[in-house]
């Protein structure tokens, strides 16, 4: 019985490392100055009448949570793993809004999240969309 229990614990431990990727929230304290310094080389800051200072990436073809990155399942759930040097900030803090004039703009926020998106599915298809500023998440079950 002792061998079975030990084997079960060992197997569960190995399985947990195989299934999940370790992702940790940023241990550093973030503020607007940090975002401004880190993101300025890659885009521009503009004053939005609705949100204040927002950041716009230089590539007009950019789409958040779609361009240059991938989804990875972690111990926090699905997390966006960005290939951009600056991706640690806008994909895990703040929210994205699509502006008719500027295109995608990032609104700074100070709470870390694995990804600020809303998920949907139909049959074997899955989709996601960035959560806009001030939106809440609702969960529903059914067919």
Please report, for each region that a protein language model flagged, where it lies by residue.
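Classical secretory targeting signals
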Residues: 1-26
């Amino acid at each position: 019985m002792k061998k079975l229990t030990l084997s079960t614990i060992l197997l569960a431990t190995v399985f947990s490392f195989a299934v999940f990727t370790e992702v940790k929230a940023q241990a550093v304290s973030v503020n607007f100055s940090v975002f401004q310094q880190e993101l300025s080389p890659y885009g521009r800051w503009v004053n939005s009448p609705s949100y204040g200072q927002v950041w716009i990436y230089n590539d007009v073809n950019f789409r958040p949570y779609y361009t240059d990155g991938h989804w990875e399942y972690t111990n926090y759930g699905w997390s966006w793993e960005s290939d951009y040097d600056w991706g640690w900030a806008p994909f895990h803090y703040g929210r994205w809004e699509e502006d008719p004039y500027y295109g995608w703009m990032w609104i700074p926020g100070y709470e870390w999240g694995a990804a600020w998106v809303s998920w949907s599915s139909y049959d074997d298809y899955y989709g996601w969309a960035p959560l806009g500023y001030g939106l809440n998440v609702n969960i529903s079950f059914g067919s």
